[in-house]
Amino acid sequence: SDGRNTAANDKASDLMALRDGCCSNPSCSVNNPDICGGGR
């Protein structure tokens, strides 16, 4: 198997978890418009 694909998948799922947690936190969301979509 390709270790790079596994690492990329792990990183993507970590980012999803970060985004979910961060974007529900207004101060974090404001500081990370690139992952939270900005707009507010």
UniProtKB/Swiss-Prot annotation:
Positions of the propeptide segment: 1-19, 37-40
Keyword annotations: Acetylcholine receptor inhibiting toxin, Amidation, Disulfide bond, Ion channel impairing toxin, Neurotoxin, Postsynaptic neurotoxin, Secreted, Toxin
Coarse class of the protein's main subcellular location: secreted
Cysteines joined through disulfide linkages: 22-28, 23-36
Region (Ser-Xaa-Pro motif, crucial for potent interaction with nAChR), start-end ranges: 24-26
Cysteine amide PTM sites in chain numbering: 36
Species in which this protein is naturally found: Conus quercinus (Oak cone)
Keyword Transmembrane: no
GO cellular component: extracellular region; host cell postsynaptic membrane
Taxonomic lineage of the native organism: Eukaryota, Metazoa, Spiralia, Lophotrochozoa, Mollusca
Record-stated family: Belongs to the conotoxin A superfamily.
Pfam families: Toxin_8
Name of the molecule in the record: Alpha-conotoxin-like Qc1.4a
Tissue: Expressed by the venom duct.
Subcellular localization(s) per the UniProt record: Secreted
Domain-level remarks: The cysteine framework is I (CC-C-C). Alpha4/7 pattern.
Molecular functions per Gene Ontology: acetylcholine receptor inhibitor activity; ion channel regulator activity; toxin activity
Role summary: Alpha-conotoxins act on postsynaptic membranes, they bind to the nicotinic acetylcholine receptors (nAChR) and thus inhibit them.
